[in-house]
């Protein structure tokens, strides 16, 4: 019996019906036991773009309502593609971050916020320095 099958599972061998259901009924059948809604994409870029679209829509909805959009964002490499997509939307589509309040999700203690390995520094380099956010709204 083979025990290490996870290394052999790839999306090009799994039928799309298992990770991209065609309708709400099929989705409910696949996700009925999940506690957290989960979407699977064929590539990290496709997933990052969808997350960025969801964040952008939330920002726009809050702008229309005249309210702040509060986000808790992580530093590090994992969200890099999401932040790149948000910066692109800001530059190409005019997505404004003026109504956004950002909380840095985590930080190393007692690391200074401008230290090389600081999560806040990486968040600034990947996203905040490239958009029109008011830095007084960054915590």
Question: Predicted segments — roles?
Answer:
Residues 2-70:
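N-terminal glycine-/serine-/threonine-rich phosphate-binding loop
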Residues 19-35, 95-139:
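Ligand-binding beta-strand-loop-alpha-helix segment within the catalytic cores
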Residues 41-43, 74-76, 105:
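Acidic/polar N-terminal loop/beta-strand segments that form early-domain functional surfaces
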Residues 51, 82-85, 113-115:
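Short, glycine/acidic-enriched capping/hinge loops at junctions between secondary-structure elements
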Residues 55-59, 81-91, 124-127:
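Short, well-ordered amphipathic alpha-helices
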Residues 65-92:
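Glycine-rich N-terminal segment of FAD-binding domains in flavoprotein oxidoreductases
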């Amino acid at each position: 019996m083979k025990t290490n099958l996870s290394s052999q599972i790839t999306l090009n061998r799994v039928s799309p019906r298992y990770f991209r259901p065609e309708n709400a009924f099929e989705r409910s059948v696949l996700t009925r036991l999940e506690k957290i809604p989960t979407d699977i994409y064929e590539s990290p870029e496709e997933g990052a773009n969808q997350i960025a679209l969801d964040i952008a829509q939330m920002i726009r909805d809050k702008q229309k309502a005249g309210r702040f959009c509060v986000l808790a964002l992580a530093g590090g490499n994992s969200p890099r593609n999401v932040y790149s997509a948000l910066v692109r939307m800001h530059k190409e589509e005019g997505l404004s971050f003026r109504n956004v309040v950002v909380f840095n999700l985590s930080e190393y203690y007692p690391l200074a916020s401008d230290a090389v390995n600081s999560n806040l520094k990486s968040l600034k380099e990947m996203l905040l320095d490239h958009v029109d956010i008011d830095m007084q709204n960054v915590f």
